A protein has these predicted regions:
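Sec-dependent N-terminal signal peptides
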Residues: 3-16
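Short amphipathic alpha-helical segments and their helix-coil junctions
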Residues: 14-21, 78-83
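Generic detector of isolated residues embedded in canonical secondary-structure elements
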Residues: 17, 30-31, 98
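Short N-proximal segments of mature Sec-exported proteins
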Residues: 21-69
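Compact alpha-helical subdomains of small soluble proteins
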Residues: 49-123
């Protein structure tokens, strides 16, 4: 009986702390960059709720990626590349929807965590 409990505990613990795949890391980094770029669009050019969503999602993903072992400096360099690409371009609703769907599917509880950030008013 002890062996079964130990094995189950081991499986749960190791899967909870599992690293993310390189492909997921790249997609999440790209989405973080998209949110980052759109969070800087002036309020007069984009609805406030979309800007706030972008800020909250960027904040959540940035923390998540660092927590999963992505190097902070490397992440910032990648984000700046993406922001440079998107800066001055119009808001793309489709890319945001794709990122939202991917994040909600890939990271459990991510939708609720992003909503907590939005509702906290602390971006």
């Amino acid at each position: 009986m002890r062996k079964i409990i130990f094995i189950i505990s081991f499986l749960i613990f190791t899967s909870a702390n599992a690293e993310i795949s390189k492909d997921d890391e790249n997609k999440l980094t790209n989405c973080t960059g998209i949110y980052y770029a759109y969070s800087m669009i002036p309020q007069g050019q984009l609805e406030l709720d979309k800007i706030v969503h972008s800020i909250a999602a960027k904040k959540f993903l940035n923390s998540y990626l660092i927590e999963k072992g992505v190097n902070d400096e490397k992440l910032n360099k990648e984000l700046l590349k993406i922001v440079d690409e998107l800066y001055g371009k119009p808001y793309d609703e489709n890319s945001v929807k794709k990122c939202d769907e991917f994040i909600y599917k890939t990271i459990s509880n991510s939708k609720d965590e992003i909503l907590k950030i939005i509702n906290s008013g602390i971006y």
